[in-house]
A protein has these predicted regions:
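Alpha-helical elements of the RecA-like P-loop NTPase motor core of helicases
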Residues: 28, 51, 75
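Polybasic, low-complexity intrinsically disordered tails and interdomain linkers
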Residues: 1-34, 71, 92-101
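Short basic, glycine-rich beta-strand/loop surfaces that mediate nucleic-acid
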Residues: 55-101
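Compact, glycine-rich, soluble single-domain proteins
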Residues: 43-49, 54-55
Length: 101
């Protein structure tokens, strides 16, 4: 899946569904089994903050997508600063985009 489509899904889910912002919130959503899609930023430093997300997603059978920057992800998530990760909890109108993945 492309990073652009993942960011589009985050924006749609933010306005019509529900998302969790931040690496800790995304981790909790995955562990609780409520995450539909996890999107994380490649430029997070230190990388250990998000390094576990792809492995945890694979273990829990959750789709996971990397995007280039935390600033782009923050904008898509509706926050004024960058965010390391976002988990989509309720996809809302982004349901069709998630099906593509």
């Amino acid at each position: 899946m492309s990073a652009e489509r993942a960011l589009e899904a985050v924006e749609l889910a933010r306005t019509t569904g529900k998302i969790k912002k931040g690496a800790n919130e995304a981790t909790k959503a995955i562990e609780r089994g409520v995450a539909k899609l996890v999107v994380y930023a490649k430029d997070v430093h230190p990388a250990e903050i998000v390094m576990h997300l792809p492995l945890l997603c694979k273990e829990k059978a959750v789709k996971c997508v990397e995007v280039p920057t935390k600033e782009e992800l923050g904008i898509a998530a509706g926050v004024r600063v960058g965010t390391a990760a976002v988990a989509i909890i309720n996809e809302g109108e982004a349901k069709n985009i998630l099906k593509e993945l």
